[in-house]
Swiss-Prot record:
SMART domains: SpoU_sub_bind. Specifically methylates the ribose of guanosine 2251 in 23S rRNA. This is 23S rRNA (guanosine-2'-O-)-methyltransferase RlmB. Keywords: Cytoplasm, Methyltransferase, rRNA processing, S-adenosyl-L-methionine, Transferase. GO terms for cellular component: cytosol. S-adenosyl-L-methionine binds at G196, I216, L225. The lineage of its organism: Bacteria, Pseudomonadati, Pseudomonadota, Gammaproteobacteria, Enterobacterales.
Length: 244
């Protein structure tokens, strides 16, 4: 099986991490972009086939998204499932996890992955039936983070949360109405942060399985933040508390 990725950062990240996955790369005919040149040089050094293509063809492969003049056909990456989680946790002294409940917009998922990678999150957990798929759009927005951070798809999020609690991982969920704020919460131990869908928040069962609910204090007239922005705020407060 193969898949398409596009964008300079996404291609560069995979090239650095797993060049064996590349099947062929297509670049825009006549494109003279200094950012592309080192990527092309490394592709050639790895012996990866490079072909020139028209903008119309590249646009079609990227489904009219912004591809920055480069599209790659690659072997499908590893898909993480819930049965991968126990072994992963066994190897973590201080787990730092992100749970996304109902983030179905690919741009939001990609931005959340980028935040998670920057914050040093060990894995992102998503419900199989209520999450955007790890498609080319997600990988483009994630700027390489989709290739470096495990995204674990689970069939039963509540069951997975119970597993985490059995491992003494403290689960903190975000809810706008929560009295306890992010900055009053202790985020220094084994931690799973739960972010809900924008506008809807966490589902009832997800909320009930949280050990603690927190809110982000808002000073202006808006009542909430974009889910990827809120995720970044919460993750990096945890990083600050954890001495990062």
């Amino acid at each position: 099986m193969s898949e398409i990725i596009y964008g300079i950062h996404a291609v560069k990240a995979l090239l650095e991490r797993d060049p064996q996955r590349f099947l062929e790369v297509f670049i825009l005919k006549g494109r003279d972009d200094r950012r592309l040149q080192p990527v092309i040089a490394e592709l050639e050094a790895q012996g990866i086939v490079i072909q020139v293509a028209s903008r119309q063809w590249l646009d079609k492969q990227a489904e009219d998204a912004v591809h920055q003049g480069i599209v790659a056909k690659v072997k499908e990456g590893r898909k993480y499932q819930e049965n991968d989680l126990p072994a992963m946790l066994d190897n973590l002294e201080m787990p730092f996890l992100l749970i996304l409940d109902g983030v179905t917009d690919p741009h939001n998922l990609g931005a959340c992955l980028r935040n998670a990678d920057g914050a040093g999150v060990h894995a992102v957990i998503v419900p199989r039936d209520r999450s955007a798929q790890l498609n080319a759009t997600v990988k483009k927005v994630a700027c390489g983070a989709a290739e470096t951070i495990p995204v674990i798809s689970v069939t039963n999020l509540a069951r997975t949360m119970r597993l985490l609690q059995e491992r003494n991982i403290w689960i903190v969920g975000t809810a706008g109405e929560a009295d306890h704020t992010l900055y009053q919460s202790k985020l220094t131990g084994p931690l799973a942060l739960v972010m809900g869908a924008e506008g809807e928040g966490m589902r009832r069962l997800t909320r009930e399985h949280c050990d603690e609910l927190i809110s982000i204090p808002m000073a202006g007239s808006v009542s909430s933040l974009n889910v990827s922005v809120a995720t970044g705020v919460c993750l990096f407060e945890a990083v600050r508390q954890r001495g990062g």
